From Swiss-Prot:
NCBIfam families: PRK05406.1-3, PRK05406.1-4, PRK05406.1-5. The gene is pxpA. It catalyses: 5-oxo-L-proline + ATP + 2 H2O = L-glutamate + ADP + phosphate + H(+). Keywords: ATP-binding, Hydrolase, Nucleotide-binding. Its EC number is 3.5.2.9. This is 5-oxoprolinase subunit A. HAMAP family: PxpA. InterPro entries: Glyco_hydro/deAcase_b/a-brl, LamB/YcsF/PxpA-like. It holds the Pfam family LamB_YcsF. Forms a complex composed of PxpA, PxpB and PxpC. Belongs to the LamB/PxpA family.
Length: 245
């Protein structure tokens, strides 16, 4: 039986965390830099604990104004401080509630930059490995960040996106483009099933791109987030695919 993990970005102040944590199997917990607060983190951790959901850190650039989606070029020392600050805070809050942090998934611009920039990818992976070599690194399927995680000796989680379109090189269509998002739930469900069952996704030019779907990212914000997550989970189960971290 095929198996896939469902993840979503939480503790970003969007208000749907409690409901989503009854549907997903991995929670990417924002670390109060690009969005959210300590109260949001503690609440998300409590809901995750209630539902047996795997916990990961979701650190981003310190860019609240743009939700961590603006590219930055930090020095290695500044990036190390930025990540250690966030990982350390979440790890402490996890331990305070008797929980373990299992993986790291960078947020927004950091995630996308590291997917294409090997030097940045190596730096991020090295910082995570230095912080705790037992942590896994979640990154875009086929990305340089995924390769860097393996090279650093980390376990990796290959991620695909339910509601984002893909470029022919396997990267995500930039959010600045009008075709970045998948238009309908039906199209997103078809894309998810294709990625999980066939290991392929249709790019914007019609070509098929190979992907490894260990985990599917679902949108965690907006009023439709919970309904969308319910549909994706139901369709996976109906197709005989186990949903588990």
């Amino acid at each position: 039986m095929k198996q896939v993990d469902l993840n979503a970005d939480l503790a970003e102040g969007c208000g749907s965390d409690e409901a989503l944590l009854q549907l997903i199997t991995s929670a990417n917990i924002a670390c109060a830099q690009h969005a959210g607060s300590i109260a949001d983190i503690r609440a998300a951790l409590a809901y995750a604990q209630q539902n047996g959901v795997r916990i990961g850190a979701h650190p981003g650039y310190p860019d609240r104004e743009n939700f961590g989606r603006t590219e930055m070029n930090l020095s290695e020392a500044d990036l190390r401080a930025c990540l250690n600050y966030q990982l350390g805070a979440l790890q402490a809050l996890c331990r305070d509630q008797g929980l373990e942090m299992a993986y790291v998934k960078p947020h927004g611009a950091m995630y996308n930059q590291a997917a294409k920039n090997r030097a940045l990818a190596d730096t991020v992976a090295r910082i995570v490995a230095d912080f705790d070599p037992k942590l896994k690194l979640m990154a875009l399927s086929g990305s340089l960040l995924l390769e860097a995680g393996k090279a650093a000796g980390l376990g990796v989680i290959s991620e695909v996106f339910a509601d984002r379109r893909y470029m022919p090189d396997g990267t995500l269509v930039p959010r600045s483009r009008p075709d970045a998002q998948v238009d309908s739930d039906e199209e997103a469900i078809a894309q998810v099933l294709q990625m999980v069952r066939d290991g392929r996704v249709k790019a914007v030019n019609g070509s098929l791109v190979a992907v490894q779907a260990d985990s599917i990212c679902l949108h965690g914000d907006g009023p439709h987030a919970v309904v969308f997550a319910e549909k994706i989970r139901q369709e996976l189960l109906a197709a005989g695919i186990k949903v588990s971290a």
